Amino acid sequence: MNVTLLIPARYGSSRFPGKPLAPINGKPMIQHVYERASLAKGLTNIYVATDDDRIKAAVEGFGGKVVMTSPEAASGTDRINDAINQLGLKDDDLVINLQGDQPLIDPTSIEQVISLFERHPGEFEMATLGFEIVNKAELDDPMHVKMVFDNNNYALYFSRSRIPFGRDTQDYPVYKHLGVYAYTRKFVQAFAALPLGRLEDLEKLEQLRALEYGHKIKIAISAFDSIEVDTPEDIRKCEQRLAVD
């Protein structure tokens, strides 16, 4: 199975401009993401998908590969779709979408989503990762997306609110979403052509579009958390984690 991992990266983040190039222990964040991903088994190729020449130069500077995408891409999925069209992938090729703000992603977590497609061929069109929340401060933080899934690990819903709500108890597991997706090239193209979903627009969560249009999302539960960098403070958290790794 041909497996291409793409790391979408844009320079103009509203909360943290230039985020992909923010230094973490002397290396740009995008390099940490790329190098972590390269440790995962089963990948055919890795590319950073960007529309910014500064990011392109940084990636090529450490020996990484880049595919330049249109600056008109309205979403991360549009950027991924643009990249796979340029790369000429086949319909049944597997695409891993690793968010470029996860410099501490564990390589085995990437392997988990790949193995879902290997073990359950044809049963679903999209897969992603979850992690049981340990830090209670994340429960009501809208930057940490929560998720619920059925007994077969198919996603039921994703929300910025705490889900599920325990009416009579606070002692129950809550899972958050980790920003890794896997899907076939054929599905990415079909997904990108779908109109914006109502729930997707409310929560500002692209994965809800798949659920709204009746597509299955298989969930793998990772044993490893992954810090998502949204603010400069998150950079310091990453450096603290790396100091003890």
Curated annotation (Swiss-Prot):
Transmembrane segments: none annotated. Belongs to the KdsB family. GO terms for biological process: lipopolysaccharide biosynthetic process. It comes from the Bacteria. Its main location: cytoplasm. Gene3D superfamilies: Spore Coat Polysaccharide Biosynthesis Protein SpsA, Chain A. HAMAP family: KdsB (MF_00057). It comes from Shewanella baltica (strain OS155 / ATCC BAA-1091). Its EC number is 2.7.7.90. It is an enzyme of class 2 (transferase). It catalyses: 8-amino-3,8-dideoxy-alpha-D-manno-octulosonate + CTP = CMP-8-amino-3,8-dideoxy-alpha-D-manno-oct-2-ulosonate + diphosphate. This is 8-amino-3,8-dideoxy-manno-octulosonate cytidylyltransferase. Activates KDO8N (a required 8-carbon sugar) for incorporation into bacterial lipopolysaccharide in the Shewanella genus. GO terms for cellular component: cytosol. The keyword Nucleotidyltransferase applies. Pathway: Bacterial outer membrane biogenesis; lipopolysaccharide biosynthesis. Disulfide bonds: none annotated. It is found in: Cytoplasm. CDD domains: CMP-KDO-Synthetase. One of its GO terms (molecular function) is 3-deoxy-manno-octulosonate cytidylyltransferase activity. Keywords: Cytoplasm, Lipopolysaccharide biosynthesis, Nucleotidyltransferase, Transferase.
